[in-house]
UniProtKB/Swiss-Prot annotation:
Subcellular location: Secreted
One GO term describing the cellular component: extracellular region
Expression across tissues: Expressed by the skin glands.
GO-annotated molecular function: toxin activity
Highest classification ranks of the organism: Eukaryota, Metazoa, Chordata, Craniata, Vertebrata
Name of the protein in its database record: [Thr6]-bradykinin RA-11
Keyword Nucleotide-binding: no
One of the protein's GO biological processes: defense response
Keyword terms, alphabetized: Amphibian defense peptide, Bradykinin receptor impairing toxin, G-protein coupled receptor impairing toxin, Secreted, Toxin
Family: Belongs to the bradykinin-related peptide family.
Main location: secreted
């Protein structure tokens, strides 16, 4: 996983 990866979309 790349750094700062998130399984949720941050809007």
């Amino acid at each position: 996983r790349p750094p700062g990866f998130t399984p949720f979309r941050i809007a």
